[in-house]
Amino acid sequence: MSLVIVLAVALTLPATMLLIAKATGGGGNVPPHRPEGPCDIYAAGGSPCVAAHSSTRALYAAYNGPLYQVMRQSDGKTLDIGVVQPSATDAGGYADAAAQDAFCANTYCWITTLYDQSGHGNNLTQAPRGPAGIPMVMGGFNNLPVADWAPITIMGHKAYGVFIAPGMGLRNDNPHGTAVDDQAEGQYWVVNGHHYNGGGCFDYGNGEIDSRDDGEGTMETTYFGNATPWYHGPPPGPWIMTDQENNLVGCVTTNGTKDCDLPIITWRFVTATADGEPHHWRSMGGDAQTGELKIMFDGPRVSKRYDPMRKQGAILMGNGGDNSNRSDGTVYEAAMTAAGTFPTQETQQKVQASVVAAKYDVPRLSLTPRSAIDTPPGLQTFSPNSAQDTTVTFRNTTGVPVTAVKLSISVHAGWTSVVSGASETSKTFAGPVAPGTSVSATFKVTSGPVAFNGDLVGNAAWTTDGVIQSETTTEKVRNVSPIKINEFAVIPTDSFIELYNAGDSDVDLSRWTLTEHPTAQPIFSSIKFPDGTKLKAKGFYLLGLANSGLVVPAQKGDSTLYVRNTSGMSVGDTIEIDTGSDVETRRIASIRTAAGVSTTLWQPLPDGPVITIPVGSTRVPYTGGGGGFGGGGGFAVEVGQKLGLGYGASFPAVDNTIENYEVVTVTAVDKPGTQTYLAQDAKAGDTTIKVRNVRDIAVGDKINLDIDSVSHGMETITVTAVNTQDGGGGRGGEPGTLVIAAPLKFNHANNLPFSVRGTGISFQPATTFAHSSNEPLLPLGAGITLDSPLSSGHAINAVVRDAAVSSAGYQGPPAPDQWFGGPALANAGSMVLRDASGLVVDSLNYGGIVDPWASEGYQGPTSGLFS
């Protein structure tokens, strides 16, 4: 190839793609050619990719950049997972799962970023809050996927898909080059056909840039699941459909029903497409392991409300346009084509051929309790010096017979693993194992005497055509005292947590902690067990929620306490502050108000989604009215009141840090942040724009409009006047008018969403810490005053207990072994019990998967891991 040709080709590729020219001699080893990927095919067909996402393989033959990023729980460090490079016998191009396994050994990892391989920078990251979402992480962020929950085989090698459980989702609300309005666009994805539910909405594709429901036709994505409130196929599903906002659409009918003649999908791996253009859309689907795609629907738009479409261009994965995130599913690869392109059926069939050639298959190796081979819990809990039967299963996904399959388990120092009923540490199957069949061996695993959180490692080695190959897999284990979170209650006058010692020996709980984490809130504290606390064998330990607790720390010399609750308290009552050796007793001198409902520091969309207010600030933007996702409705704060400003978060938000409050005094309460829409088309050159709601917009506000795409452009405008009436925030309200400082540079469509930060809450003194979007803003109220100052300081959530109160807190019987002051138990949350060294002893989620890593039990398709 000449230099001129090399340069010509290189100019058509993203910057992360490399063409490497090698001078080879006559007998040199030349790696196998990496075949063209789906995005090469789309480009050749005239519909190049504008977004290309996969955790399993490169979607271009020449792509050598990162596929995704993982972050580990133990220290917050991150690692980009790239593609395996070619070797003499291997074309490479699949994900480097071994790098992830090494980096994430003995801890948990999250997928923080799914990189865009197209070169347009359309990476997918943690989905921000939205009104239809289950608020999981601080302020309403979605949870991130756990990195190893979806193992598979691709191109004969291990890789991991993106596993979505309810509450999880990835998104990009500020994309580049995606279709907007009625522009054409194509999409495809490969998913697990056995992992789905009827919750909304397991989608991939084009959504709203404000993570809200902006009306019919404001999104167009693929959808997979068996939801029935909208268009749907015959029961029980699942079906390949699309999501076009306020409608899951599998077809368009003429008889007034929403019953579609769609096939019930039974394939383990599924390819699906969703292509839309003016007046027309088409969906196709097929078995990702064999054959061609079939037409699911090819015809007109649903109704005039969807024709023309009003797409906005955001990119979402695993959730809906309004962040509805109640879905289950697993994504392996996906892509969107450029604005104004409509892939032909021939192009989509070639993409399907590329998917089939990638040879997706179930995981080759699993490590599970013997009793749960098909539904592995992902975690086994031992007590020191105990034994359990653990099974290693090898499934031949090579496509040819293999021989000499050897299975074993690698264990932590001080542990042992032997074949059940024998003394050997491995088991070998000499005869051929046919493609698609499995062999397994069960081992007696005995834990050591030392407490441990980490991995068991399952090993397999086999021979193919005289070549020995191997693979490993892991299972999380805990080797800890047999203390269980036995039961709890979330009742205003009966909130408690009970521990149980399932062992035959007493256990010392000195300096253990229990972290109770309410959904959508950061973690501020843990319940601490005092020195000398022992839990008898087969005994119970009861933690009771006190009628009140500190919402911010109290300092030595303070006479005012800011508390969670004052209901039932009376002047003159004796109260206890804290517990154990730290307890102080005082009388109540006066009672004013308890802490109010928190809101969050404003999260702007589509710009943002995280803004940081620097040290030295005296004003913060805030979420008004509804109180944000951290505290529900009812947020109110007044001049002169104390306000707690949360700080200490890290991003992405995974509830892996401890939050704190700094306390300020409010000096002014001005306009909150707001999200609203253009009320009519705005044209380049205009110096006024019509908007739905001007109530919280002020002179001087800067507004970011639109996205960077074909016939559209991003620009920042400055408001110089706010004229006429308030639109009331609704779509039917009378619009208001904004006068702007300079003429518009681009055209912008009616219904375009935008955000305004507002003039915020002012306070003194200036901040000594930085504060970021979605961190809590807590009105502290006026608190209660004491008859004398405190003799020592007390931490946030320390007990404030008034024995005379019967209307709040745990009332018994029986009396608790220990009181705790907060946080109050919520309707959803997680609990994590740790020993004195910080090892996790027990954990659970309730009311939702608030902290996925703390989940115990099988997470996956109802039909099992290998089906």
What are the roles of these predicted feature ranges?
Residues 385-400, 492-505:
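Short beta-strand elements of extracellular/lumenal beta-sandwich folds
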Residues 30-137, 188, 356-359, 484, ...:
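GGW-centered surface loops in extracellular recognition modules
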Residues 36-39, 533-796, 800-805:
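Autoprocessing Asn-cyclization modules and mimics
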Residues 400-404, 504-510, 841:
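Short acidic/proline- and small/hydrophobic-mixed sequence motifs that coincide with surface turns
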Residues 375-386, 489-491:
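Short, solvent-exposed loop/linker segments at the N-terminal edge
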Residues 32-49, 58, 62, 73-75, ...:
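Extracellular glycan-associated modules
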Residues 432, 446-452:
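Short, surface-exposed loop/turn segments at beta-strand-coil junctions that are enriched for proline
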